[in-house]
Every structure is written in C-alpha cells, then in structure tokens.
Amino acid sequence: MTTTNTSIFGPRVNNSKFNNNNNNNNNNNNNNNNTSNNNNSNIIKPPQVVQETQQQQQAQQQPLQTNEEVCVICKSKNVQVCTGCLMVYYCGAEHQNIDWPNHKSLCSGLNRRNDLLDRAEKSKDLRKKLQSDIFSSGNRVSNSNNNSSIYSNSTGNINNNNNSNNNNIKGGIGGGAVTNSSTVMAPERKSIAISNIKHLQQQIQQTQQTQQQPPPTTTSIPTQPNSSSFNKPTAKKPGTSFKSSSSGDNTPINQSPSSSSSSLVSSTNNNNNNNNNNNNNNNINSNSNNMSGSSGGIKALQNQLQNSINNKPSNTTSNSPNPSPPSSTFVPNSNNNSNSNSSSGSGKSNLNISLKSSTSSSPVTSTYLYNNNNSNSNSNSNNSSTETTTCISSNSNNSSNIENSDNTNEENGMKNIKNKLSQINFGAPPPSFKKPTSKVIENEDNNNSNNDGTLKQSSSSDSIYFNNNNNNNNNNNNNNNNNNNNNNNNNNNNNNNNNNNNNNNNNNNNNNNNNNNNNNSNNNNFDINNSNNIINNKQSTCSSIDGLSYNNNNSGSSLKNSVPPTTSNTPPRKRSSGGSSSSNNSNIGSNGNRIGFIKEHKKNQSLPDSFVDFYQSNKNQSNGYESLLDNDDNKTRGYGSFNENDDSHEECDDDDDDDDGGGQDGDDGLDGTEFKRGRNRPTGLRTNNNAVFEWESGTIEYSTNNTSQHKKLGVGSRGGNSFSKDTQSQSTNSTTTDDHQTGSILNSNSGSSDDLQQQQTQTQQQQSQLSAGVGRIAGKFRMIGGDIKKKAAIVGTLTKNKVSEVTSKSKSSTSVNNNNNDEVDHNENNNNNNNNINNNNNNNNNNIENIIFGIPLEEAVKKSATLHPLIPDVIYKSIEYIREKGIQEEGIFRLSGSANAITLLKNEFDRGVNVDLYQQLDQHVVSGILKLYLRQIPETLFTQDFGEELEELRVGGNSSDAISKRIAGSIILLQRLPESNRCILHYLCNLLNAISFEPSTKMGTVNLAIVFAPTLGVSVEVMTCLISYYDEIFGIQTYNYNS
C-alpha cells in the first residue's frame, strides 16, 4: 500500500509497517468505531469527478458476465482468465490492455494486488486536480487534546500486524491522515487537502509564536519533518532509542513517557501465528472540517511554512509542562515503527527527551497482559478519558522466572508428566517387581504465577532432584537448606535410584548376575544379624536362595547400583544361579543343616529316582526315602557317599570292587560348603567294542568272545547308565558262571585245605556280589525289556529264513535224486531263471548307457544332444525354461529348490526319459538341476589345461588395463576350448547377462559370478568379465555344427 505525499496531505498517524510473512493479512480497519467527518464546508465538485463517480457506481451495480469463458473483446474461446478477479477472460495481452480502462474499476483483485504503477498514476492525477482546483470550507476544529501513541510489541515468532486505517480515518492527529489512492474518491481527498491547508496555517502561527518566546532548558525534536528537507539524526542519549520509520525520519523514542495525558498501550504477543487486530476505538477522533474559506494555494502555504521553519532558532521553546516521574518503565521493541505525538496546546508536536534513567524510586505500577494461545485477535481499546499503562517488567534480578504465557497449569502438568516419564525404568525390573515411590516434596509457590513443576526443598526433609538427559529441562529453584541432594542421572539403560531415608543402618544388596543390575535400598528400622541365622527352605522345588548379601556392621553408607531399589516390605528375590555372601556361614546354620537344590539335567540323561527326590535330608526322611549317607543298602546299590571337598561328582558305577559298594571314600556327613555346579550330573556312558547294541538303528553286531576279558554291555544314548563287567557277564550267561563256580569247587579238592578255604571265601564273595548285582541289573533290564523282545523277534525271523532256505535246498536235492524224469523240467526252470537274470542285467546295462550326469561332456553330447548339436538336452532345456519363466524370478540361481524334486528330475534324465520341464512350477528346481549337472562334470567347462592362463587373467583387479587384458585373454582362451564347452559357455553367459539387467531378480553380475565361478572352475574376476562384456567376448565366436 502506498501513501500520498506528506507535504500535501499531512503527516501519517501511524507510520508502523509490518511485513506479512505467512500470508496472514490482518487489516485493522476501524469501520464502525470511528465517527465520520463533519464536513460543514460547501464543496463544489467538478463535473468530471461527478461523472467518474457515477460510472463507478453503475459499474459496481452491473454484475460480471462469467457464464462463458470467452474473450470480452473478440468473443474468442482461446482465452486466459484475469488474475485479479478470476472472472473476466481475454484472448491475449492486447485485448486486455484495450479493455483495462473499463475493467480496472470492476476488478476485485485490486485491493489484493500491489498495483503500484496504477496507483502512482492516480496519485499524480489527483495532485494535479488538487493544485488546480482548491475550494474553501468552514473552520477546521482539530481535536489534538487526546493524543495516543500506540506501541505494538511483537515478541512472538510469526506476528502479522497491519495497523492501517483504511477509508475510515478522515482526519489525522496533528494534521496527518492516511489515505489510499486507489480507494479514496476525489471529493473526499479535496476535503482532506482543504483541512490540511488550515492545519498548515496553524503551524505557521505556532512557529511564529515559538520564535518570540525564550528557549527552555529541555530540548525537543519536531516529529513533523519537512517534505523537502530532513533533520539530521541526533546522537543517542541515555534513555532514548532511535527507530527507523517508513517516512525516512529517525525519531528517538523515550523509554519513560513525558506527558501525563498521553497513554501508552503495549500489546505483547507471545504466541505463534497470532493475528493481532488492533482496533483503535474512540481514540483517533474524527476531525470536524469547519473550514469556511482560505486564501492562497497549498504551494504558497508550504513555502511560507518552510521559510518560517528555516528562520527559527536552534533552541525552540515548548509550552508543554515538565514531565512527571514515570509510573512504569516501558522498553519498546525495535520492530515497532510508530510516531508519538504529544500535544501541549500548540499545533506542533514535540517529543521531550528526559535525561533521567529509566528506573525511578516510585513503585512500578504494571499490568501484565498475556495473550491466550487459542485467540486469533487481540483488540486493545484505548479510551481518551482513562489513562492505563500496560507494560512488562523484565527484571533480571528476580529469583522467580516469570514466563510470558498464560499456560500456568497446563504447562506445569505437561512438564511434570515429562519428568515422570523420563524417570521410568525401561530395563531391568521384572513385571512383578514393584518400584518404590520416592518421597519428593514439591512446594508450589502460590505468590508467583509460575508453576513450572520444579522440585523445591524444605528445611526438615531431603529431596531428590531428577536430572533427565532425554531433552527435558528442569528449572530448579535454589533454597537455603540444602542438606542431602542425591542427583540421579536417568540415562537410557542405566538407572540409578537411591532412596536415602533418615535411619540408614543396614544395606540389603540384591545382586542379579543375569541382568548385571544391583538393587540398593536403605531401610529405616530393619536390622539383620547373620551370625547364627538358620534358613530352612520347605518348598517342594527347593530353589537356592542366592543373591542375598548380609552386612553385620551397622553402617550408614549406601552403594549406588544400577537397579531401582526394593522397599522394606518387599522380600529379596530368589534366584537359581550362584550367590554371594559377605559373611561366613550365611547359608549353613550351626546345626549343620544346608539348603538343598535341584539341578536341571539335559534331555535323555536319566537320573535315579533317589537323586530326583533327594534335595534335603529332612525332606527325604519325611517322604519315606532312606538316608543315602549312612545306609549300607544304598551303598551296595551303587550310590556312594558324596564328598563335599571334591570338585566334581564321580560317576555312579561299581567298577571298583574294593570300595564299599563301588562308591568313593570320604566323610558321610556334609560339610558347610555348598554343592558344586556339576555335583549330581552323570558323566558320559562307557561302551565297549566287544558287543554293541544299537537300539536306534535296529541292528545287532556280533564279535568273537575274548576269554581273557569279560564282556561289557554298553547302552546307547537312550539308555540310562553303564554297568560293571562282572555283573554284565553274569547276567548275560548266568548258567556259565554257575558251572564255572562248581568247577572251581571240584578242582579245589585236589589241593590243600588252605587253598580250599581261600576258594570258599572267594566263592562267597562272588555270590554276595552276584546277589547284589543281579537285583540291580534286573531292574535295569525291566526298562529295556521291550526293546530286547523286539530284537529277539528280529533274530528269530532271521533264523527262520535261514532254516527255510536250508530246507528248500534239501528238498530240491532229494527230489532230483528220487525223480530222474523231472530233471528236464528242472533244467528248463533253471534256464528260465538264467534268462530272467540275463534280461535284468541287460536292463541295467541299458540304464547305465542312458546316464548323462557325471560322465564326460563329449559322451553326454553324443547321448542326449537331440535339440542342439553341441549342447546336452538337460542344459538346453534348463536354459530355455529359465529364459522364458525365470528371468525375472527373485534370487534365481541363488535360492535352492526342493531337493526331492531335483533328485526326481535327475533320475528321469538318467533313464533317458524325454522330460518336459515346463510342467515344473518352481523355477529354482530347474536352476538347481542345471547347477547340479555342471557341478558333476568330471572336467570343468574350462578344463584343466588352462589353469595358468586363467590365473594370469585374474591378476590386475578392476583397472581398465586389467579389464581390457582380461577381455582379450578370454577371447583367445575360448577359441582354444572344445566347441561343446565353448557353446555351453556361450549360451550360459547369454542367459546370465540378461538376468543381470533385471532388477527384480536382485542378482547382479557379481552375485551371478560368485555362484557360477566355482562350478565352472574359473575365478570370480574372469566370470564377471564374461557376463559383463558378453557381446565383446562371444560376438566373434564361431562354431562348426557339421562336425
């Protein structure tokens, strides 16, 4: 928007201009609030102006014809719409220029467009008319007693403030007015010009009066500059700040207002994207134009005013009284462009500059105005009768932080929620773990209007400050009594929470080795003395209570760990892993009782029932199990005593006959130490090569008996335990042992009596061992009795088959001897059988002849090259199938197909069947059969004669020289290969080159080279070159198909 010349139409009321950054136009139009001008002058309108106004009124009444999109001039349909109103169409710029005089008054987009040239032309025409035709009017009454200076502080991010008084403010304060050259009519402008003439005459009289008066002590700077000459900007003094206005003058603005009648209104906008409509109601009073007549033109009055201003002295006087002490301190923003006009009874407005500081001893009377976030308009109404001072006190010495927003409750709630969310532990504690709440005292300061959620301390209790590293800002207010502050840093994974209560006597440290987190809780009145405590676990599962650590010393020190602490009511968690203790005999009481446990064994590893139920001596006795420590029967069964001092538990067998029951020597009682980890776990089972029973496979292997060594029965992985040599031999053949015993007794009669006694004692020992071992082995064989019966049945069937064969042979031999007439028939049958055998052999020979997998390539070409003279059918069919159906398959040649389907295809090709690969639905099966055939060729496609040449081609990397050398070497090398090998490589590389250009396959050149390089017996670099430069290498290859 352009403004008219201030020398003609007077100064502007409000020279503040704001840019519209986000296309939010907030025009503060004072439409219904400002009263109209009382034009009491008899203005004679020229006929031209009257005619123009009538034409404009008629044009506004006539609606635009927008039914058809045709040109207004030539009615053409190849048109473009007017960008201003979007309602009129033209076929080109020429017709638009022709119709523009008629259309410009009707275009609705003139108010939205910056049509500066058109407005400038209108302003020039208006100046010429006003200079030629000046009419007198009545006396003008200027209302300059109530002057208001409007400051708009925009502290928000994006504030669009357009403070413009359009079409409604007919007269300005101090002789200034804001006019719009595109919307104000000519008669109204004339009335404004006439009123300005009267104002200029008053200014001339004021200047003459001020020249006659003596200069005062205070300095004043006129805020009404001359249009032709500008005042130089004065030096910046304390308490003043210069501001650049749109008219070009540098006007200092006093931080403390000087006149008591002027009111300052500051609207502070702290919101984002707020549209502030400052409607000045009843402040800019309309001017009554009572000008009845005037003599001379505007030019003469301006010259007279200029001469009077040039002739005045440097020190001017002012009738304004001395400024009163300020009631408030106001610091305007540098973005404001406004003129403060203070009236002191004279026509010319002066701005008195006080050299006092901005602060005064009088109390600051301030009213804080906060804008709501949801409000889109902020209207500030200033009445002339009231004097309000709205400002913002920004004192840096304040201890409380006063924010510029009204979100006291909502923002505090959000901050508290964020702080609590940041303290949440997302890691170690399990779902059942109840995290205690810390007693934090939050003191809300009701005196201040800032409820920012900070943690405040009291003099009697300690508080915890939570410093969050996850972008959360906490405003902490420092108080006087800061005794104990535990700063807990809530990081992403490590959470350290220490609850320090008044009586820190004992520490209950729960160490979790699995999660590497340590819980530390300081309880108030919970004393633990672990010198003579006995813990007896009566649960059925008997899980060891690890993770407990006891401190006998009553100390107030606390350990900072990485897991939230438990409360005093929460018992320590039980864990099955190894624990730690800080005092001796923490798990074993004074009476020798210990905490039992259960070891979880691997699958298919059997364990005796006594061990399963043996986890506590009292438990065993209560359930009816005999003690395994003092009972001799248990020792005879092979369960020896446990020695706590050993590192590991030995295997439960009775190989050593000298020990009591095959166990180990040691103390029967239990020591104070715990069982080791692998104490009850059985070791691997022993086997012997003499006789091995493989229960899984169902086969029985026999070996010759060794008389010098007893047999030993070894059970497979599904068996439970291993057995001794003597008992195994006695169980397998008890009758032989009895005969051996009796034989030894009979042979002993020839000896002496001493030898007889020794033999008797030995036999007694053997019998006692036999009775104990047989009872144990019988129980074991009950478990595997079913399997033995099955194997016996297998043996029985084998023997029956053998017997039937023997009997059939014997019968055939007897029949030949008895019936001589049947020899011919028998010979014929034998001949028939021989013929059948020969036929079967011929079929096998035919199958061997049709095999193509695993034979040399030359023979395969001779056998199966029916579709192509140089390529076997399996390769040719596979390549053509993949070219049609698998060239866009993802992961072709990389993903493997079904192994069973590939095997079936291989068998069909080996039998010589004409296989139709198009019946296959899986492309990966066909690619797998192709790779299988190339892999099973005895010699690779490049043969073994060119190993050194291929190695030389590999050297060089990916440089241009190495690639060119590789291409030339590959051409020469292919020409030296057999034609079938070269032709297969030609077809294969053609397919791979086409696949490399398909993005859906996700198989590039390097991926394909990695797949086929080992199969073809070549390096990856050479294979990549063969695929990438297929045209250069194979384009010159020729083949002799006639051979």
UniProtKB/Swiss-Prot annotation:
InterPro entries for the chain: Rho_GTPase_activation_prot, RhoGAP_dom, Znf_MYND
Bias-annotated ranges (Acidic residues): 644-671
Subcellular location: Cytoplasm
Coiled coil, from the record: 825-852
Gene3D superfamilies in alphabetical order: 6.10.140.2220, Rho GTPase activation protein
This protein's encoding gene: gacZ
Stretches assigned to the Rho-GAP domain: 855-1043
Zinc finger (MYND-type): 71-107
Biased composition regions of type Low complexity, renumbered to the chain: 14-44, 201-225, 254-293, 307-411, 467-532, 547-594, 726-736, 752-771, 801-821, 829-842
Protein's name according to its UniProt entry: Rho GTPase-activating protein gacZ
UniProt-annotated binding residues for Zn(2+) 1: C71, C74, C91, H95
MF (Gene Ontology): GTPase activator activity; zinc ion binding
GO biological process per UniProt: small GTPase-mediated signal transduction
Protein species of origin: Dictyostelium discoideum (Social amoeba)
A Gene Ontology cellular-component term: cytoplasm
Its biological purpose: Rho GTPase-activating protein involved in the signal transduction pathway.
Lineage: superkingdom: Eukaryota
Biased composition range(s): Polar residues: 241-253, 453-466, 615-625
Site residues, Arginine finger: R894
